[in-house]
């Protein structure tokens, strides 16, 4: 009887070299089955003791190989199900079917966006585009050729007056529909909007006042006299303190202006800012110097305030004044007043 370790080693060598499945006569023992699941551990035994266990290890290896061959050679029975290999990765989904979209989507009818008619109410003339092009082409032709074309089409050529009447009718119908569409939406509270009438538009308050002033002063507001800021404040103060005594007519007579000017002064609520007040005083000071400079040239003695500013009367005027008559002096004063206005 040969040693099992020698035969097992020879059988493994021949099988690996020739790649031939050699059946084994040995049966699988429970001990061999337990060796399949036995964990392999590294031995820390000395060298002289390791030789004692070589035969047992070779025997277990041979039994393991024989059990694998037996499992591979035996066909699966009807009751036993073949083992499915375990998947190392997740199952991949099947590739999408490109035909499912075509199957599920409903078939849309073939149409063209230009084939749709315009919305009702937007355009009165619903004639097709080809007929419109044909009409435009026919308009450039001579009258005889147009009559022949209309006769071939079985229609009568419209006259120029009839064409203009149709055009005006279409424009009026368009305007009417647009007004009805604007008034049908309705405003707040469900009330329809009022139609816009261009002949009678809504006017603001200042427009009414402007028209009233135009009727009252056709040539515009031209005051004969300008009052200083101090005079304006004095008019307001007098009328506020003594309204019964200093009425509009009395103030107009006192300051030699029209009653309308007094009414405007009392009605106005505008007050200048500090910067505007400074500019206003400077402007009136320059105006006063210019006026009294003219008076001084005519021989009128200016007040002390303006004499301190360097305005002195003309000395030659007095010498010439002796020779002039009263009438000449009166004419000179009238001319002076007219130039100052």
From Swiss-Prot:
According to the record, the segments passing through the membrane are none
Here the segments flagged for biased composition (Gly residues) are: 181-190
Q: Which InterPro entries match?
A: NGRN/Rrg9 (IPR010487)
Q: Name one GO cellular component term.
A: nucleus
Record keywords: Mitochondrion, Transit peptide
Q: Where is the transit peptide?
A: 1-60
Keyword Aminoacyl-tRNA synthetase present in the record's keywords: the answer is: no
| Span list, region Disordered | 37-129, 149-217
Write down the Pfam families for this protein, in alphabetical order. Answer: Neugrin
Q: Where in the cell is it found?
A: Mitochondrion
Q: What residue spans carry the Basic and acidic residues bias annotation?
A: 112-129, 149-172, 201-217
Role, per record: Required for respiratory activity and maintenance and expression of the mitochondrial genome.
**Assigned protein family:** Belongs to the RRG9 family.
Give the protein's recorded name.
Answer: Required for respiratory growth protein 9, mitochondrial
């Amino acid at each position: 009887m040969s040693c099992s370790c020698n035969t097992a080693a020879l059988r493994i060598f021949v099988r690996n070299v020739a790649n031939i499945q050699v059946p084994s006569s040995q049966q699988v023992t429970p001990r061999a089955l337990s060796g399949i699941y036995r964990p392999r551990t590294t031995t820390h035994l000395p060298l002289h003791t390791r030789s004692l266990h070589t035969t047992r290890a070779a025997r277990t290896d041979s039994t393991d190989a024989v059990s694998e061959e037996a499992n591979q050679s035996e066909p699966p029975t009807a009751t036993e199900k073949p083992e499915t290999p375990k998947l190392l990765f997740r199952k991949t989904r099947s590739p999408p079917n490109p035909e499912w979209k075509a199957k599920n989507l409903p078939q849309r009818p073939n149409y063209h966006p230009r084939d749709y008619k315009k919305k009702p109410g937007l355009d009165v003339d619903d004639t097709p585009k080809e007929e419109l092009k044909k009409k435009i082409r026919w308009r450039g032709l001579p009258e005889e050729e147009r009559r022949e074309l209309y006769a071939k089409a079985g229609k009568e050529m419209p006259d120029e007056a009839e064409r203009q009447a149709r055009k005006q009718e279409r424009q009026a119908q368009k305007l009417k529909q647009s007004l009805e569409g604007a008034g049908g939406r309705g405003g707040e509270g469900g009330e329809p909007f009022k139609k816009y009438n261009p002949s009678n538009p809504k006017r603001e308050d200042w427009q009414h006042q402007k028209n009233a002033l135009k009727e009252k002063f056709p040539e515009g507001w031209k005051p004969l006299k300008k009052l200083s800021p101090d005079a304006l404040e004095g008019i307001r103060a007098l009328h506020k303190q003594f309204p019964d005594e200093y009425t509009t007519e009395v103030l107009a007579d006192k300051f030699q202006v029209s009653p309308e000017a007094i009414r405007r002064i009392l009605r106005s609520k505008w007050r200048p800012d500090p910067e505007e007040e400074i500019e206003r005083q400077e402007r009136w000071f320059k105006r006063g110097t210019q006026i009294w400079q003219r008076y001084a040239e005519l021989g009128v003695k200016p007040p002390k305030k303006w004499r301190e500013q360097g305005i002195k009367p003309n000395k030659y005027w007095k010498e010439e004044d002796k020779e002039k008559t009263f009438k000449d002096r009166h004419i000179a004063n009238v001319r002076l007043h007219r130039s100052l206005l």
